[in-house]
Amino acid sequence: MPKMKSVKGAVKRFKVKKSGKIKRGTAYRSHILTKVDGKHHRQMRSSKHVDTVDAKNIKEMIN
């Protein structure tokens, strides 16, 4: 049986760390950020981890 192809959109959006957790970017950062207060804007810079519920599906898409 042939290997499953990875979902290229998921490969570009997620990275698997050494610990096995999946790193993702923050949503709502594209435009119209003048209305967002400075604290929230700074917090959106940092990357987040994917929830454990979604991690299994994302790992299947990446591999």
UniProtKB/Swiss-Prot annotation:
It comes from Sulfurovum sp. (strain NBC37-1). GO terms for molecular function: structural constituent of ribosome. This is Large ribosomal subunit protein bL35. GO terms for biological process: translation. InterPro entries: Ribosomal_bL35, Ribosomal_bL35-like, Ribosomal_bL35_CS, Ribosomal_bL35_sf. Belongs to the bacterial ribosomal protein bL35 family. PANTHER family: 54S RIBOSOMAL PROTEIN BL35M (PTHR33343), LARGE RIBOSOMAL SUBUNIT PROTEIN BL35M (PTHR33343:SF1). The lineage of its organism: Bacteria, Pseudomonadati, Campylobacterota, Epsilonproteobacteria, Campylobacterales. One of its GO terms (cellular component) is cytosolic large ribosomal subunit. HAMAP family: Ribosomal_bL35 (MF_00514). Keywords: Ribonucleoprotein, Ribosomal protein.
